[in-house]
Amino acid sequence: MGNIKGIGRIYQQTFVDTYSRVAMVKLYTDRTAITAADLLNDRVIPFFDEQKIPLLRILTDRGTEYCGKPENHAYQLYLGIENIDHSRTKANSPQTNGICERFHRTMQDECYNIIFRKKIYSSLEDLQIDVDHWLRSYNETRPHSGKYCYGKTPMQTFLDSKYIAFQKNISSITQEPDISFDYLNSSVS
């Protein structure tokens, strides 16, 4: 994010649901695998758990805070514990993560450009409070023109999609499975 007088260097971790555009942001004074995992642990996973929807896959850039050897990289370990598949953007191709990049531009225009003109921040916590206030508005009151939003808020889109996903899941569960079990060989085919 940049250097803020009185606070120092600030880094932003961002999560954007690519279907609904629901976004979550947390600010940090460093950029590490631990802080990347903290956003998921503190905000993202609890949100999805509350909605009773599993987070199956995540797309990140190729930054060192997200990528490393799975057996000793904090972010990779966290994804493994949570059973989340990890996809990475193409190298030197920010457009691969265009939804997140577009969100950053919106946040810069609608949040940071305004709040930094109104107030001088002396702590990361104060800044996070104002960022969270803007995020609530973005997610819950600001209509979005995204592919699946059709002028609804990201949260309305998420809740609508939750119902659709539930219906699809029910139909796949109620179909007769095509499984035969051979007791002699103990194999599933």
Each model region followed by its residue ranges:
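RNase H-like DDE/DDD metal-dependent nuclease/strand-transfer catalytic core used by mobile genetic elements
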Residues: M1-Q12, T18-D132, R136
